Amino acid sequence: MSTQLASNIYAPLYAPFFGFAGCAAAMVLSCLGAAIGTAKSGIGIAGIGTFKPELIMKSLIPVVMSGILAIYGLVVAVLIAGNLSPTEDYTLFNGFMHLSCGLCVGFACLSSGYAIGMVGDVGVRKYMHQPRLFVGIVLILIFSEVLGLYGMIVALILNTRGSE
């Protein structure tokens, strides 16, 4: 094996695969969570739109909150991609760390999107019958959204460990 292709034990040639997998996991899973939240909430909005069209604008809050989840994944994916380079040694530690960053934010946003979708769908339908539920629904949506934010915070903390 030539000296050019030889790698040290801490930076094997396959290590960047894990970084790319983390980048992909961050985007795919967080966008999947955003899509689930948007679709489930959108079903409820479409359901009330036929009865009370004036409530549609106030009912878009779950859809907007679901879209923010994809931004969390995008931020982490961009940070991971910024650390990937074909010319520098990429350690196995960094590869696993970036994979865990992507999975952390991805699964957190996936679960958050599912929660937002469920609360958004049922909440919008019940809001049509009882407008006083609006504040409670928004609070539950905020607590559902913060699950994805927790995943992003942990991913950012993990990402800073690799660049030390």
From Swiss-Prot:
Cross-referenced SUPFAM superfamilies: F1F0 ATP synthase subunit C
Name of protein: V-type proton ATPase subunit c'
A Pfam family of this chain: ATP-synt_C
Quaternary state and interactors: V-ATPase is a heteromultimeric enzyme composed of a peripheral catalytic V1 complex (components A to H) attached to an integral membrane V0 proton pore complex (components: a, c, c', c'', d, e, f and VOA1). The decameric c-ring forms the proton-conducting pore, and is composed of eight proteolipid subunits c, one subunit c' and one subunit c''.
Transmembrane spans: 15-37, 60-80, 99-120, 133-158
Classification via InterPro entries: ATPase_proteolipid_c-like_dom, ATPase_proteolipid_csu, ATPase_proteolipid_su_C_euk, F/V-ATP_Csub_sf
Further information: Present with 538 molecules/cell in log phase SD medium.
Record-linked CDD domains: ATP-synt_Vo_c_ATP6C_rpt1, ATP-synt_Vo_c_ATP6C_rpt2
Gene3D superfamilies registered for this protein in UniProt: lithium bound rotor ring of v- atpase
Family indicated by similarity: Belongs to the V-ATPase proteolipid subunit family.
Parts of the chain on the Cytoplasmic side: 38-59, 121-132
Any one of the GO BP annotations: Golgi lumen acidification
One function term, GO molecular function aspect: proton-transporting ATPase activity, rotational mechanism
Site, as annotated: Essential for proton translocation: 145
Purpose: Proton-conducting pore forming subunit of the V0 complex of vacuolar(H+)-ATPase (V-ATPase), a multisubunit enzyme composed of a peripheral complex (V1) that hydrolyzes ATP and a membrane integral complex (V0) that translocates protons. V-ATPase is responsible for acidifying and maintaining the pH of intracellular compartments.
Cellular location(s): Vacuole membrane
Keyword entries, A-Z: Hydrogen ion transport, Ion transport, Membrane, Transmembrane, Transmembrane helix, Transport, Vacuole
Highest taxon listed in the record's lineage: Eukaryota
GO cellular component: cell periphery; fungal-type vacuole; fungal-type vacuole membrane; Golgi membrane; membrane; proton-transporting V-type ATPase complex; vacuolar proton-transporting V-type ATPase complex; vacuolar proton-transporting V-type ATPase, V0 domain
Vacuolar topology ranges: 1-14, 81-98, 159-164
Topological relation to the membrane, as annotated: Multi-pass membrane protein
